[in-house]
Amino acid sequence: MARISGIDLPKNKRIEIALTYIYGVGLSSSQKILEKANIDANKRCKDLDDNEVSLIRSIIDENYPVEGAAKRVESMNIKRLMEINCIRGKRHRVGLPLRGQRTRTNARTRRGAKKTVAGKKK
């Protein structure tokens, strides 16, 4: 089983798909990595030899912020938006959708479960 950036890649999947299990590596970047490493995208993870794995590992370490580094960059960007008080930062702070979605109905994922309010007594 190949271990890259602290993630055990699934051995029966194609290497192109297996690389997407690493946070910060999507399908397009995994295709670029394999193209740069000159490895067939249809090859299974279990069929990779050690120098191919080390080549992929070195390409990812040099060119891509992955796992903790990518999460750190993302959280710093959100924190920066909140500090400069732009509309996206304010929406992050309040926990509402950022990109113009309606909030009168729906938006349950972002707002959380319904908070029931006691009805008025007559």
From Swiss-Prot:
Subcellular location: Plastid, Chloroplast
Keywords assigned: Chloroplast, Plastid, Ribonucleoprotein, Ribosomal protein, RNA-binding, rRNA-binding
GO MF annotations in UniProt: rRNA binding; structural constituent of ribosome
Protein's GO biological process: translation
GO cellular component, one term: small ribosomal subunit
One Pfam family per UniProt: Ribosomal_S13
Ranges in a coiled coil: none
InterPro entries attached to this UniProt entry: Rbsml_uS13_C, Ribosomal_uS13, Ribosomal_uS13-like_H2TH, Ribosomal_uS13_bac-type, Ribosomal_uS13_CS
Region entry Disordered, spans: 102-122
Keyword Ion transport in annotation: no
Function: Located at the top of the head of the 30S subunit, it contacts several helices of the 16S rRNA.
Family: Belongs to the universal ribosomal protein uS13 family.
Cross-referenced NCBIfam families: uS13_bact
Subunit structure: Part of the 30S ribosomal subunit.
Name this polypeptide is given: Small ribosomal subunit protein uS13c
Lineage, highest ranks first: Eukaryota, Cryptophyceae, Pyrenomonadales, Geminigeraceae, Guillardia
